Amino acid sequence: MRTSFSLRWPPALLWATAIFYLSSQSRPLGRRWPSLPSTLAHVFEFAVLAALLHRALAADPRRRQRTVAPAFVLTALYAASDEVHQVFVPERTATPTEYGLDLLGALLGSSVRQWWLRRHREEEA
């Protein structure tokens, strides 16, 4: 079943806005709350974004598998822009390690979403 633009895109756009907001903070989240490791935060943020972007791009169920790569690429580009954005925020830096963690999250989110769709397609068959 196809869903409308107004139902598919807002979650991804809101999540991207939340990432931007967190990246705009002078002190990283991990420094405020040591119990939440920064490493896991990066992976989680971008895993969720990749899954939400895949959901947004996959309006037609017959084309869902073809939207995994574009969702990953869009997430990777957003992660790169997020790292560049952090260069201009006081007390923040951009590092290749953080970008790598963002990409790991994007890969994880895309993979889990693809696995989920395959599993549910097989159950329907």
How should each PLM-predicted stretch be described?
Residues 1-55:
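"…centered on the first transmembrane helix and the immediately adjacent amphipathic helix/loop
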Residues 25-26, 58, 90, 117:
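Short helix-capping/hinge motifs at transmembrane helix termini and TM-loop junctions
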Residues 120-125:
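Short, charged juxtamembrane terminal tails flanking transmembrane helices
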Residues 12-23, 68-84:
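Small-polar-interrupted transmembrane alpha-helices in polytopic inner-membrane proteins
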Residues 33-36, 80-103:
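Interfacial helix-loop-helix junctions of multi-pass membrane proteins
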Residues 4-10, 36, 62-70, 95-96:
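Membrane-helix interface segments
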Residues 45-60, 104-117:
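Membrane-interfacial alpha-helical segments at the cytosolic side of multi-pass membrane proteins
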